[in-house]
Amino acid sequence: MGQILLILLLQLIYVPVLTLRTIMLVKGKTVIAGLFGTLETLIYIFALGIVFQDLTTVGMIVYAVGFGLGILLGGFVERKLAIGYNMIQVHTKEYPAELIQQMRDNGYGVTHYQGQGRDGVRYRLDVLAARTRMKELRELVEKHEPKAFLVAFDPIDFKGGYMMKGLRRPK
């Protein structure tokens, strides 16, 4: 019974570490990804060694269930850490002057454009925001432009501009 619980525990550690390693690699943080990869491999070998010592159906099922639960836990950890930034496009029918000002007052850098949509003139705002501030930004948009269309992208790299100063919360 002790080994079964150990297998489950190791999987609940292993998969979130795997998740974090993948995120760090995608975000370009290769040194941190390498450290997570080393830890991930140690846990993997240790857990598999325990399973192979006693090839019971229960051990294999617990290993698989632990992996599935680890994915859920890894996703939860990823959402809580919210590492990185999002580039958000806000599309509106009317020129959103008040929203633009509120965003700037709240420390966001905003670039706005006018374009031609199928049914007439449309406006697009480009806003770079830390993922930890996404909920706050969505609420701000919802308050001022409830019918706005939002699209979020994960930028791989960026440099310069107001962005660097604007990513911090206003004091």
Curated annotation (Swiss-Prot):
Annotated Gene Ontology cellular components are: plasma membrane
Q: Which InterPro entries match?
A: DUF2179, DUF5698, UPF0316
Please give the coiled-coil regions recorded for this protein: none
Highest taxon of source: Bacteria
Protein's membrane topology: Multi-pass membrane protein
Query: Where in the cell?
Result: Cell membrane
Is Zinc given among the entry's keywords?
no
User: What are the protein's UniProt keywords?
Assistant: Cell membrane, Membrane, Transmembrane, Transmembrane helix
Pfam families assigned to the protein according to its UniProt record, in alphabetical order: DUF2179 (PF10035), DUF5698 (PF18955)
- Membrane-spanning residues where? 4-24, 32-52, 57-77
The family classification in the record reads:
Belongs to the UPF0316 family.
Q: What is this protein called?
A: UPF0316 protein EAT1b_0871
Q: What does UniProt list as this organism's lineage?
A: Bacteria, Bacillati, Bacillota, Bacilli, Bacillales
